[in-house]
A protein has these predicted regions:
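S-adenosyl-L-methionine
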Residues: 36-66
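Short beta-strand element of Class I
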Residues: 24-25
Length: 393
């Protein structure tokens, strides 16, 4: 299954989709440092990446017609700053909104499916009309906004076409869902909107993959069986943080189901085997695992606990990652995650390297889609697509 990816960043989404079985024919990204990082991994011969073609370019200048008919999937994460909870919430007034370019790529390549990722701020009530507008454009990509149209006028045109039930031309069946990466084995609480569409003439029936991990299973492992502490050669804490009612609820959730889920992964699961970066002995065996001084707790930014999923890894403002990119150690002290630790929490493989400075690498990692989350969605999509090929074959 051939694919192209827009706004590829440092390659998190691309890696996950490649692991699911998609063959990327082109990755388009404007940011020079992100492109250079992917290219370094290509040069190092990283499996599955070595054949990628990465183009540092403004997607607004890309002509996709050469991919029409040969691409089964278009994927990408249109820049999220217009919708970010940490941004100024400009959305349709923000020139950084690249969803129109995602729609154009779909229109020109006519893929069997697409996968787009964005921040949960996209679902803010203040953006609800514009989000519906995005979905309508993806459903009917050939209904193009004319130069003198406002987005509201274009939306009215799309609504009329949609409600008329026209089945001619290129159209997609589109669904979206807010997913927590922790529910798919990522050691991090990270909520992202995933939009998936299948070409209407494919007649594919699909839904988002079920969660594979749960908070209840983690609590059960800690406070019912104690398995979590045994796995980490730790003594079970004497203080029970759950009430009797909460503990009963956890038991029911785990014991009274036919399909028990795996437990959420924690920071300790992800980085517990790495040497202390402040101790240079043994650190050299791990690339990108250098200590960074200066971490401190301040209001609203207290760092991530070792025995919980990490807080959301963030790109940071003005090149300075926030308290979310710190870890609270067992002695109560805090320090910044190393680049390698952050990469692990985003489920990048250890041999996928980040060659820029700490600040730049943390920015790239913070902007990435967790590899495991991308793979979970990609696995589900490609399974349905292969089933269609088998049925039609």
């Amino acid at each position: 299954m051939n694919s192209i990816e827009l706004f590829s960043g440092t390659g998190g989404l691309a890696l996950g989709l490649q692991q699911a079985g998609f063959d990327h024919k082109a990755l388009f990204e404007w940011d020079k440092a992100s492109c250079e990082n992917i290219k370094e991994n290509i040069a190092n011969g990283y499996p599955g990446v070595r054949d990628w073609k990465v183009y540092q370019t403004d997607v607004r200048t890309v002509n996709y017609n050469g991919y029409t008919g040969s691409i089964q999937l278009v994927a990408g994460g249109p820049p999220c700053q217009p919708f970010s909870l940490g941004g100024k919430h400009q959305a349709y007034n923000d020139k950084r909104d690249m969803f129109p370019e995602a729609v154009r790529a779909v229109r020109e390549t006519q893929p069997e499916a697409f996968i787009f990722e964005n921040v949960k701020g996209l679902l803010r009530k203040s953006f609800s009309s514009y989000f519906n507008y995005i979905l309508l454009q993806l459903q009917h990509p050939e209904i193009v906004k004319k130069e003198n149209m406002t987005w509201e006028e274009h939306m009215s045109l799309l609504e009329k076409h949609h409600t008329a039930g026209h089945d001619d031309g290129l159209s997609y069946n589109v669904v979206f869902r807010l997913l927590n990466a922790a529910d798919y084995g990522v050691p991090q609480s990270r909520h992202r909107v995933i939009i998936v569409g299948f070409r209407s003439d494919s007649n594919i029936s699909w839904s988002f993959p079920n969660a594979t991990h749960s908070q209840e299973s983690l609590l059960y492992s800690k406070w019912v069986t104690g398995d979590y502490w045994q796995e980490h050669n730790m003594k079970k804490p004497s203080e029970m943080p759950l009430s009797t009612a909460q503990l009963r609820s956890v038991r029911r959730a785990v014991e009274e189901t036919d399909t028990p889920l795996q437990r959420w992964q924690t920071v300790r699961d992800a980085i517990g085997d790495l040497p202390n970066p402040a101790d240079e002995h043994g650190v050299g065996a791990y690339y990108n695992h250098e200590f960074r001084d200066g971490a401190r707790i301040y209001a609203g930014h207290s760092g991530s606990k070792m025995d919980e999923p990490s807080k959301t890894i963030k790109a940071g403002a003005h090149g300075v990652p926030g308290g979310e990119n710190m870890v609270v150690l067992d002695d109560g002290s805090v320090r910044y995650y190393t680049v390698r630790e952050s990469a692990r929490i985003q489920t990048f493989p250890d041999d996928y390297i980040f060659s820029a400075s700490w600040t730049e690498s943390m920015r790239q990692i913070g902007n990435a889609v967790p590899v495991k989350l991308a793979k979970a969605v990609g696995d589900s999509v490609i399974t349905q697509m292969k089933g269609l090929v088998k049925h039609n074959g």
